[in-house]
Amino acid sequence: MKKVLLALSLVSVFGAVNAAEVAPVVEKQTCEKAVYPKSALMNEETGTVLLSVLVGPDGSVVDSKVDQSSGSKTLDKAAVKIYSSCKFKPAMKDGKPQQAWAKLEHIWSLS
């Protein structure tokens, strides 16, 4: 039986962040558990999904999109679902929460 490896990689915000700005940070413990989709597992699909997630000032996900597909629509949709369930520490500018895009990577791997 194959061992399933899921890797969550974190976050950088588009553009430069200066000392007065802080990027959004995912609170991993709030995310839906990453479960390898059955059909992708049966078809031995793997890959890396690059996502953009728009985080609101309250830390909730406002929008998300796939920037680069894993090559599997099933894995892409599952990654979007996982990160859409997460809460984030919002981006901060001058001590105030801001809406900002974050870039995330999710690696789906069988080993």
Question: What role is predicted for each listed range?
Answer:
Residues 45-70, 83:
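Short tight loops/turns at secondary-structure junctions
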Residues 15-19:
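Sec/Tat signal peptide C-region and signal peptidase I cleavage site
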Residues 20-52, 78-111:
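Short proline/glycine- and basic residue-enriched helix-capping loop/turn segments at helix->loop/beta transitions
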Residues 4-13:
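Sec-dependent N-terminal signal peptides
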Residues 70-77:
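Soluble non-cytosolic domains of exported or imported proteins
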Residues 11-12, 67, 104:
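Hydrophobic alpha-helical membrane-insertion segments
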